[in-house]
Amino acid sequence: MIQTIRGFRDILPGETPLWQTIERAASQLFEDFGFQEIRLPLIERTELFARSIGEVTDIVEKEMYTFPDRKGENITLRPEATASVVRSYIQHKMYAADPIQKLYTMGPMFRRERPQKGRYRQFFQINAEVFGIASPYIDAQLILLLNELFKRLGLTDLTAHLNSLGCRECRPLFHRALTEFLVSKQDRLCSDCRRRMDKNPLRTLDCKVPGCREAMQDAPTTLDHLCSDCSDHFTTVKATLKAQGVDFLVDKTLVRGLDYYSRTAFEIQTTALGAQSAVAGGGRYDALIKELGGPEVPAIGFAIGLDRLAEVMAQLKGCPAPRGPDLFIIPLGPGAMEKAYLCSSRLNLVGIRSETDYNGKSLKSLMKRADKLNAGHALILDYRQPDKNAPVLRNMKTREQVTLGLEDPTDEVIKILTNEGTLRD
């Protein structure tokens, strides 16, 4: 038997209603906030991610699915979406029409991480990106948007963690202080952190090795080295969130795992899965568009981990039952199956969800199937004695039933179900 590759999985019909609930809520909220959807390829040139995410990161060094195509060019299954959205913004010169763009996208990403609870090698994200606005108020708005989305989904046990990573003006001062600290602790650091000390010291703060985390407890923080502009920016973000009633914690250890972040960085974390884990995160990346060959345009965005969010919701609220049909049509006797098919198809075309039987089963077994499908009504078309047995419409919840005319019952069914107001949304 052929099975899925390790770290990959199927999202089965019993799970997809929950995913659809999240996706619909996100799409509606994004559009309310003025975002437009963009759809992107799953494969990009490897250079895009090496230049944007950073060559000295776990993602680029250890986790990307990279391979040469037939012409020898290195291509990569996208490990995240922001770089692809930026590439599209530059390639299609969206900035020429209007530098301010608010875009969102949904889809699978790929990283060859160690599979564990809530983490897969193919995982799904919901991403939002804003280009062309440097104001701290848009930072606050994106965090507010996330807070509102989770509220609409019925999740309350979540905490926003904030930090500021500084800018090109003040980060070099922090890098020097951090490097000096790392040199004094290098005998306690793992080989990766010792290698990254000179190339990209900020990445050492993201190390998951317990010994490194212990050694880094007294490390310098970005907040202690902010320039006045970055400090004012972060102060405004915090004040705006507080004014809007959004709870948050300032987390000096939060650096995110991607090199392109600057100034505001944030995560939405939960303890619902046991250990503290992030269900969403993002931040500013004001230099990335220029770094990838575009104009100097400020930008900010976030990603929601759809797999992890769905797991949290399933654990806290359970998965919604799959939606049953409004009507299950039971054909009995010669010619009944054709009538049932025609009736079912017509009902589907006018927005009434209906199913029927194509296997010639008995009345008893088909009534059981109507119950199993959680059908709202059953329509019995008994053609065993067509001149005597009129169609019967039964409410599967109340068990009340009504006898219909001998002719095609479709119009009567539409009228009754519409007037009852029992059709499923």
From Swiss-Prot:
InterPro entries: aa-tRNA-synth_II, aa-tRNA-synth_II/BPL/LPL, Anticodon-bd, Anticodon-bd_dom_sf, His-tRNA-ligase, HisRS-like_core, HisRS/HisZ. GO terms for cellular component: cytoplasm. Homodimer. This is Histidine--tRNA ligase. Keywords: Aminoacyl-tRNA synthetase, ATP-binding, Cytoplasm, Ligase, Nucleotide-binding, Protein biosynthesis. One of its GO terms (molecular function) is ATP binding. The keyword Transport does not apply. Belongs to the class-II aminoacyl-tRNA synthetase family. One of its GO terms (biological process) is histidyl-tRNA aminoacylation. Pfam families: HGTP_anticodon, tRNA-synt_His. It is an enzyme of class 6 (ligase). SUPFAM superfamilies: Class II aaRS ABD-related, Class II aaRS and biotin synthetases. The gene is hisS.
